């Protein structure tokens, strides 16, 4: 392996969604540098941050059909009973909600938490309040994805925040999806809520850091283990 290949392999790939922003940041840096040279370096720092933001690293995904895997990188900001948003069609009974807050330094690629079929995708316009606030799940712009798994229906909600103003979802209704599959992203700083059945054995607590596609949020069979993994 050449030195160039080694250097290339040591960095996470950049998702194609980021290229327009990276190019725009760099062009603006050049323009600012033409006006006053120190501004170029300020713009270059922002360009490097943009490259980092849109990184899309491979993950080691555990292949256990009884596990619910984190759909987002970030910090677990809420774990507890909550009535899911009405638009998801999951009923009025409480389910377990796990919220993952993604700051501007988190990888913002969202991944499928459990294998199944996409039953519905529901976009809901709204505000752009701080995504860390509990009320963001009710009032902020969001996009809900309902997955019909072998253990029942699970809701995943992408929530825009004060900085994030663009929710992207690549999945479509009736798609068959697998655990760890990329299904969307949110730009720039946001939150992701997941609504799961009450019988799930929780494996995370508030304040814990989660890794999309790897961290086990909960299990339908507390005794189950896995020896199979997928790199993606």
Swiss-Prot record:
Coarse class of the protein's main subcellular location: membrane
Pathway annotation: Phospholipid metabolism; phosphatidylethanolamine biosynthesis; phosphatidylethanolamine from CDP-diacylglycerol: step 2/2
Post-translational modifications: Is synthesized initially as an inactive proenzyme. Formation of the active enzyme involves a self-maturation process in which the active site pyruvoyl group is generated from an internal serine residue via an autocatalytic post-translational modification. Two non-identical subunits are generated from the proenzyme in this reaction, and the pyruvate is formed at the N-terminus of the alpha chain, which is derived from the carboxyl end of the proenzyme.
E.C. code: 4.1.1.65
Entries under Pfam families matching the protein: PS_Dcarbxylase
Modified residues (Pyruvic acid (Ser)): 190
Residues flagged as site, Cleavage (non-hydrolytic): 189-190
Family: Belongs to the phosphatidylserine decarboxylase family. PSD-A subfamily.
Quaternary organization: Heterodimer of a large membrane-associated beta subunit and a small pyruvoyl-containing alpha subunit.
Protein name: Phosphatidylserine decarboxylase proenzyme
């Amino acid at each position: 392996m050449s030195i160039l290949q080694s250097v290339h392999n040591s960095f996470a790939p950049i998702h194609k969604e980021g290229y327009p922003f990276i190019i725009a940041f760099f062009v603006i840096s050049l323009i600012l540098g033409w006006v006053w040279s120190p501004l170029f370096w300020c713009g270059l720092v922002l360009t490097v941050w943009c490259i980092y933001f849109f990184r899309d690293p491979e993950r080691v995904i555990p292949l256990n059909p009884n596990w619910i895997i984190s759909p987002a990188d970030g910090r677990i900001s809420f774990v507890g009973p909550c009535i899911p948003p009405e638009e998801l069609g999951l009923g009025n009974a409480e389910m377990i909600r796990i919220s993952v807050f993604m700051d501007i330094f988190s990888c913002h690629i969202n991944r499928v938490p459990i294998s199944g079929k996409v039953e519905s995708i529901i976009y809901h316009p709204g505000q752009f309040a701080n995504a860390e606030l509990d009320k963001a799940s009710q009032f902020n712009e969001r996009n809900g994805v309902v997955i019909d798994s072998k253990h029942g229906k699970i809701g995943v909600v992408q929530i825009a925040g004060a900085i994030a103003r663009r929710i992207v979802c690549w999945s479509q209704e009736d798609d068959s999806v697998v655990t760890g599959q990329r299904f969307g992203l949110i730009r720039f700083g946001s939150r992701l809520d997941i609504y799961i059945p009450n019988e799930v054995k929780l494996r995370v607590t508030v304040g814990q850091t989660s890794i999309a596609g790897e961290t086990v949020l909960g299990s339908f069979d507390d005794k189950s283990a896995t020896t199979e993994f997928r790199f993606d």
